[in-house]
């Protein structure tokens, strides 16, 4: 069964929705773990920058690869995926839950 990437929101689209509705919000990312082969990011999303607790969180794990975006940018890709997951875990999923970037990885396997 195939899938249509156009039915998934990009992280950029989710961010635009978030900032449009929460101009005083805050997004915080943390590199939780990194070694020579992989990294793990956590993102926290806050409705207001002064909120003591996040409204939603998201995690992402990426491995460095020999081809594709993760050959040169697995850390950046991981942070972006983590942010997209945190936004989707709240209300910014725009239909299907995974981001377009995450679903694009399916073709790699």
Functional labels for PLM-detected ranges:
Residues 22-109:
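Positively charged, aromatic-enriched nucleic acid-contacting surfaces
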Residues 1-23:
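Basic/polar, acidic-poor N-terminal "presequence/leader" segments
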